[in-house]
Regions:
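Asp-box/WD-like beta-propeller blade repeats and closely related beta-sheet repeat scaffolds
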Residues: 26-28
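Short glycine/acidic-rich loop motifs that flank beta-strands on beta-rich extracellular proteins
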Residues: 1-2, 18-24, 48-56, 76-83, ...
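Right-handed parallel beta-helix
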Residues: 5-19, 33-48, 64-76, 86-99, ...
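Short, contiguous acidic/charged loop-to-helix segments that flank catalytic cores in large enzymes
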Residues: 110-112, 138-141, 159-167, 243-250
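Aromatic-lined ligand-binding clefts that engage carbohydrates, nucleic acids, or primary amines
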Residues: 59
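Short Cys/His-rich Zn2+-coordinating modules
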Residues: 73-74, 103-105, 156, 237-242
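Short, intrinsically disordered, low-complexity segments enriched in Ser/Thr and Pro
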Residues: 130-147, 319, 323-326
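Acidic, glycine- and Ser/Thr-rich low-complexity intrinsically disordered tracts
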Residues: 187-326
């Protein structure tokens, strides 16, 4: 694990390693100090040869990373695993990863109400898992909140294209999901449910749970944090007002819209009733896989450039010309 600010890690090929490809810690979340680290134009493959389901091709902690234009493949677990704030993950190609894991994703982060301001955009993710393992595409696990995910293309994801694990203040739009095995989008309400009844997530959201402890360690009520992330101005941690849309555990104030989904069930996916109550799920376009030839240049031969007639200028769909190594 490299501990360093103001550095660039670029133009490397990393392969046949036991665990991480690149592990980094930089910046300081609580003081909103960015690490100013760039991880770009790296080819990472054949990682996690020993530590099968620990680590990732790129694993980051802290604040202020740009992770862009990398290609990641042939991994047993996650492609990019991040935590912290102010990260931008864009223009990466991730395929043939999570080959020996299920509760995982090509891009993964989780379990935090204090990791706002991260952006995941314009990534190409395809052909994950293996015959016996069914991972997710982009996985915002365990009530992770405040993420922005748009313009990504996800193809042949064995489980859920976009797995939203009960978080709030999520902005999920203009993504394209093709042939997800279970759901194009799964959005549950595990944090709220964990308070209402005994569930697998209850220990994390009860009064002494790690979600609340993490919140207490974060200066989210400070002027600096509320200026950086205005959502915190309205949020409350008052256990006597658990039905408020501003109570942290509720899957509220999220927007899931304008996503283009090709699904044989003609479904956006599995959206919990409390998500529908507290957030906006709207204007998603659902098509049969039979319509793929109408939308893409030559999808049968792997060309997923959008045809001119279907490239909606009002949306920020994936731009494949910017994706991958340069």
């Amino acid at each position: 694990m490299l501990l360093s600010n103001n550095c660039n890690i670029t133009h490397n090929e990393i392969y046949e390693v036991g665990s991480y490809g690149i592990g980094l810690q930089a910046g300081d979340k609580n003081s909103l100090t960015k690490g100013n680290v760039v991880v770009s134009n790296n080819l990472i493959h054949g990682y996690q040869k020993i530590s099968k389901v620990l680590g990732a091709a790129i694993q980051t902690y802290g604040s202020g990373f740009l992770i862009s234009n990398n290609e990641i493949y042939d991994g047993n677990h996650t492609g990019i695993h991040y935590s912290g704030i102010y990260h931008v993950i864009e223009n990466n190609v991730i395929h043939d990863v999570c080959k020996e894991s299920d509760d995982s994703g090509a891009i993964y982060a989780g379990r935090s109400w204090t990791s706002y301001g991260n952006i995941i955009r314009n990534n190409l993710i395809y052909n994950l898992g293996s015959n016996n393992h069914f991972p997710n595409g982009i996985y915002l696990d365990d009530a992770l909140s405040g993420q922005i995910v748009y313009g990504n293309l996800l193809i042949n994801i064995p489980s859920n294209g976009l797995f939203l694990g009960g978080g709030r203040d999520l902005k999920i739009y203009d993504n394209i999901v093709i042939n997800a095995g279970k759901n194009a989008i799964l959005y549950d309400a595990r944090a709220r449910e964990g308070l209402q009844k005994e569930t697998f997530f209850s220990s994390h959201v009860k009064e002494d749970g790690d979600m609340w402890l993490d919140l207490k360690d974060c200066p989210w009520k400070s002027e600096a944090w509320q200026e950086a992330f205005p959502e915190y101005k309205d949020l409350i941690d008052d256990m006597s007002n658990i039905d408020s849309p501003y109570f942290f555990p509720n899957p509220a104030s999220s927007v899931v819209n304008n996503n283009l989904i090709f699904d044989k069930k003609l479904s956006v996916g599995e959206i919990h009733k409390d998500v529908k109550k507290y957030s906006d799920i709207k204007n998603n376009i659902i098509k049969s896989p039979n319509a793929l030839s109408q939308y893409f240049m030559d999808y049968k031969n792997g060309d997923y450039h959008l045809s001119d007639s279907k490239n909606n200028k009002n949306c920020q769909y994936v731009n494949l010309n910017n994706v991958g190594m340069y």
